Amino acid sequence: MDNSGKEAEAMALLAEAERKVKNSQSFFSGLFGGSSKIEEACEIYARAANMFKMAKNWSAAGNAFCQAAQLHLQLQSKHDAATCFVDAGNAFKKADPQEAINCLMRAIEIYTDMGRFTIAAKHHISIAEIYETELVDIEKAIAHYEQSADYYKGEESNSSANKCLLKVAGYAALLEQYQKAIDIYEQVGTNAMDSPLLKYSAKDYFFKAALCHFCIDMLNAKLAVQKYEELFPAFSDSRECKLMKKLLEAHEEQNVDSYTESVKEYDSISRLDQWLTTMLLRIKKTIQGDEEDLR
């Protein structure tokens, strides 16, 4: 069956679901189990939505899932309603990102009302990702990652909470909210130190915190590096700590060549990602005689 055939079938299912809803509101249905007709309508709306998905008509699929969700709410089937709102959100993602967010927020309201905070947290991440990639509103993405982290923390899912917080820190630093980023990197780094599995990553978090300090002020960065070495002696031997010390020295001497050379040397072994490149360029611009490139 081609897409137009699937769409025609979906439209027929929608009409059938609407008839069921209408019939459920009649006087006799009220006496003889109108709710079973509503249940049938829910099922038919979901079938129509899936048929629209097959036809790649994402908006129509989203709308049909929303209709099913509203009927589930009428029947007090909260869990089913939330599931349908999530399905609607996933369909709308492909056609109308803002509507996808609205549907996911409806699902989140239901899940939090039911005390299902882990699932609510997961959907806050989905919303954050839509703001990151589709709507490019980083402030709103940050807010949803923070909300997700809060819910995960409340449920003792600390590693999931930390993943969200690290996203917040990365974006906060790019938005020049350095203190916010520092607080998160230090908190996650300190927690990682105490875990045999995560210990190795602590140096990366302290390195990122030190770079944020450096963007505020060189003396800040110097004191931060000393603090991290005392707190986590393994940091002293890391390539990240050695790079920080070289960068501080180059900055103190206002030696842009030495700064660039140190970054190049580090990059030849550990490739710099976009975030590190941005931060290192910001610091480099504070050295006199700066050129625009790191390498």
From Swiss-Prot:
One BP annotation, GO: SNARE complex disassembly
A GO cellular component annotation in the UniProt record: presynaptic active zone membrane
Membrane topology, record value: Peripheral membrane protein
Mutation effect (K140A): Increases interaction with GNA12
Keyword Electron transport in annotation: no
Modified residues (Phosphoserine): S26, S29, S195
Disulfide linkage: none
Compartments, record wording: Cell membrane
Modification N-acetylmethionine, positions: M1
GO molecular-function terms, A-Z: protein-containing complex binding; SNARE binding; soluble NSF attachment protein activity; syntaxin binding
Swiss-Prot/TrEMBL keywords: Acetylation, Cell membrane, ER-Golgi transport, Membrane, Phosphoprotein, Protein transport, Transport
Entries under InterPro entries matching the protein: NSF_attach (IPR000744), TPR-like_helical_dom_sf (IPR011990)
Keyword Iron: no
Physiological role: Required for vesicular transport between the endoplasmic reticulum and the Golgi apparatus. Together with GNA12 promotes CDH5 localization to plasma membrane.
Summary of subunit composition and partner proteins: Interacts with PRKCABP, and disrupts the interaction between GRIA2 and PRKCABP, leading to the internalization of GRIA2. Found in a complex with VAMP8. Component of a SNARE-like complex that contains at least ZW10, USE1L, RINT1, STX18 and NAPA/SNAP-alpha. Interacts with VTI1A. Interacts with STX12. Interacts with GNA12 (via N-terminus); the interaction promotes CDH5 localization to plasma membrane.
Family: Belongs to the SNAP family.
Name of the molecule in the record: Alpha-soluble NSF attachment protein
